[in-house]
Amino acid sequence: MITLRKSLSKSCKDLRILNGTTYVKGFCSTTTTDTTTTTSTSTTTDTDTNSEKSNKEKLFHQINELTKQSSFNKVLFYKKSAHETEGYSYKERQQFKQKQQKIKQIKHNQQLKQKQQIEQQKQKKLEQQQQQQQLELEKKQKFEQQLEQQQREQNQISLLEKSKDLESINDFGDFDFRELETKPLFSVPNVLINYLENEKTLSDHQKSDVVGSFYSDGEIPSVPHINLEEYTRSVLIEAYLEVCKPEYAFYYFKQSENNKTNSKGLLLMIEFYIKIGDIDSAFKFFEVNFKDYKDLISTNDYYKLFNGLITYSIDNQENIFDIKNKFFNVIINDNINNDIEKFNVGSLASMIESITPKYQPPPQEQQLMDDDSNSNSNNDSNNIIKNSSSKLEFNDDCVSNYKKLVNFDQLYSIYKNNYKKYTSDQRLIILSCILKYSIITADIELFLNTVNRVLVKDGIEKVEIPILQILFEAYTHTIPSDKPELVGQLKYLLTNYIKDMDSSDNGYKSISKLIAYNFSFKGDIKNSIYDQLCGIGIKSIEIDIENNIENSVLINKLKQEQREKERNQFIIFIQSIFPEDRIQHFVETALIYLINDNSYQEAVKLYIYFLKEGSVTGIDIFLKYHELSYKNIVYNNNNNNNNNNNNNNNNNNNNNNNNNIKNFTTFSENDHKTLKTFWERIKNNYVNNNNKQQQQEERDIENEFIFIGKGEINNDQLLEKFQYIKEFRNIKSFFNSYEENLNPNDFINYIKNIINKVNDDDNDNDNNNNNNNNNNNNNDDDDGGGHGGGDVFKTTTPKKVKPLISTIQKSQNELPTTTTYKEIIENTSFFRNQQYNFNRELSSTLNSPKSRLDLERLQSFLNCKSHTESMSFQQLCICLELVGDTGFKYDFYKNLNHIQKTLIITPQLCKNLFSTVTMDESIDILRRGLSRISPENLKSLGIWDGVFQGLLKDPLKTPLANFLMYNGFISKSSFDRYSYCQQIINTDIDAYYFFLDPSISYYDTFGGDIEDASNYNLKKDSSKTFFKPMEDFFITYLDTFFKASSPHEISQRPDYQTQFSNYTILSLIRLGKLNEAFKEIESLSPAKYNATTIGLVVFIYSKRYKQDKSKFLVEIQSLIQRIIFDLENKMGSEDARSYFHKYILKSLIINYGNIEMDNLIANVDVPKVLKDIDNSLAPNFDRRLIRKLFKVRGYIKYRFYRLN
């Protein structure tokens, strides 16, 4: 276009303008200025240039033709002024303009045509490139598939040829397996077989233990008919398959004379074919041999095999339905109703579950979930509510595939025909699958038939909670919205059968647990049921649980809107399904479950909700909740001393039977009236007053509630503390204000004091009240159980026991003078259940800004010998805890100065303490922080003397000795360590022996790996390392020992020197002094080496010759020869070999990770060594060592074949 314009400009000379039209000599054209035209940066090819020239020629030709037709072509226009153009008519000018417009249109069309041609050429080239790439890709894929197919066929042909070769040999007599006898892998099992056959002294259990050593999972199955020799053959099959020699495994498989005992081998062979990807061979092998073994293959083995096939098909993108059909065709053989019974229903259901399509939320719901994850906290709850109300949706493909995979008609018919053969767990699993399937596929008939089976044939008392939860899910979530008849049918069925249920039925408890579950967000109820539901796979109620939060505050972290939404859905379900007169019983029982599960807040929520809805009489639930909580928390262990009525003795035994609803009507009519009056007063007189002053008064009252303790409380104090109780009328406001940290004790004490206050209003004085209670005890026996009525708070209160928290007052002057700390400490209610309740209460007390303890009185109490001698370990710890005032954080000795200031720890106190506790309790005390105190302070406090005096009374000193060493108890200081060690030596020389050489326990601790043990101190903080004082302590005490021990003692224990050397070597290794350790080793005769010594030697050699492996092997082999030579000289050839294999070889094997075991195996006569192992086996040989020695075979086998 630009080139054309330039050409035209050059040709245009002698222009003359007429009414906006430029007349050109020879031709005319309308020219306009295009200010927006941009020049192209692309390079024009020769082809494009030629094309452009031809186009211009055509264009010129068209323009000339037009101008020839014009009457103006005869007129030559020269450059003249405008007035010289006068004389032309309007018509002539218009004709000329029209021709000019035609010319312009022709040019425009030509340009469009040219652009289209260029685009077409580009598109054509792009398509050609794509076609070329596609062809190359297809060619490459085809080549890879052919290559893979060839490889697979080659492998299969190779395996089949080997199998045919083996099968063609008559009785395998011509097959030479003698080469196997020369390899260590196979010599060990043959030795084992000979050993088992020839050894008559071992029991069957010992033989099983030996055979079990071949397996990492331990003992062989305890099946009576299994022949040990045949079972060992499966060991050989497994060994061959591990080294990819299936032909040898097949040899042993076919060699078995009794095929029925070799089912293990069959499964191993099939698993091997699956592992190498030869599914056809696996199925063929399975099908050919299945008939011989189907009666012996366990359900678990079937399941493992099936899972292996499914996993393979998924990993390799095989058709899962083909795999499934092949598998079931082999097992079922067109007779499903008979053979499928051999299939454990639970396993079958689990298989179905493993390949069941999972629910995927619809796109709009997923969007809500995505929005929720990206939104701020203010919008989280709204999205969750939207999400939680949606129905389950499954696409047609999902349902279709599911129907292909599982024939539920057959499954259901099997269930109906074999109902009595199933356990309750199996029924639960299979019914869950059927229910789930019917919901997914919207099969109303199957769903109703199944529910009818659950409710009618099974009876709801046999229905477990997950089934009920599925029905609840179906009712509220999963039933398709276009199937209202399903909801109606379900409601009808549930309502009819729940209405006639007796409270003794199991189903009664199940429904109550279901209610408790839907109100509980923590504890055993929640966890156990939630796990079961997740296992079944039904979409459960979505609850935002944060597992890292303390249970006591978990519910407060859940989003309020979501919680209420789900709870309300469940309440609607309960109220629409359950008959009105039955809801109360279920809710009452649910309350019991919640309370027993320590879900107090949830119980209160449940209680308040039904009170608010009016479907349950609030006061009745309140009474039962209050009484039960009171029993469980406050006076669980106290006896009812004031109950003089013998008729009630039997009823008192029912106090702990919290699961029977009939035992909770223990309040007399007078109690009901009193509490009902109180309750009505609260409900009717509540006024919502926003006055700040009144709110502050209420908060002050609430704060006072926290510090009311257990035990007897003076009514005068209550009157003073709760003078504003009438204004604080609504108990619900108390719950709401303490939702963040509601403590059951707060609630109980709050209720207790309110009731006492009401009783004070209704009765003249306490004496009259007590008299009334006694009268009630005599007159209200028909009310059943418990305390026989009356004011339970007063009749059950121990008169002489004051609570510790009652000492918390506004000032010390208010401390009751009658309280004795011995009574506090000896109150058993403080120490029951491993002090759980007490610790919780104590912790809140000590952390409270209002807490004040009479430390001086506690000090005087603790420093009294008669007191401390009668105290238990736990009681003393709590007293010290109180003095330390650290809030029960298990480090109350941390600040020694604080303890010294607040408590006079006398030597007498410590000696009394540590001489009465056991060794474990001493260690516990030490762990709690005494190790942070310097030995000097320990000595000055007398604690050290007390510790050792307690130790010397206990014969088991090794744990404490190890503990002392690990914690660096004996450090570099002026502290007289020698005298204490001397005390131990003088008392029990064996104690000192263990004290100095806990190296054996190191083997147990670190699994026998000396390298890990030697690095142990490096992983710890340097100030707490065990070996900080090692250099100057243990070696020095070797001399101490010998000085304290007589020559006779040493001669009686010749291994002492070895043990001391071992510990010296280990100490030097940990100090990094390998040269000194090596010298110590060389100074010790090899004949005195034991297993620990050899382990240390191998470790040091591996470090010393780390850069020269050949030198290392030479030294090790030389060492072995020296050891055997010295041992033979000392104890004879046979004993020496037995000793060698018992200790030396064991150490080499235990520490194989620290040495070049590959090279050692390659250079040592391994078959001879293994033969020596066999020769060393004797009836009195350590069974554990037998197991370890045979486990060596697996490692040597692996290493040997990797090298060869």
Curated annotation (Swiss-Prot):
Whether Coiled coil counts among this entry's keywords is: no
Q: Where is this region: Disordered?
A: 32-55, 360-387, 639-660, 761-797
* Alphabetically ordered keywords of this record: Repeat, TPR repeat
Q: Which InterPro entries match?
A: Glucose_repression_reg (IPR052292)
Compositional bias annotation for Low complexity: 32-48, 374-387, 766-778
What residue spans do the TPR repeats cover? 263-296, 379-412, 583-617
Q: Which PANTHER family match?
A: PROTEIN MTL1-RELATED (PTHR28051:SF1)
Instruction: Indicate what this protein is called per its UniProt record.
Output: TPR repeat-containing protein DDB_G0287999
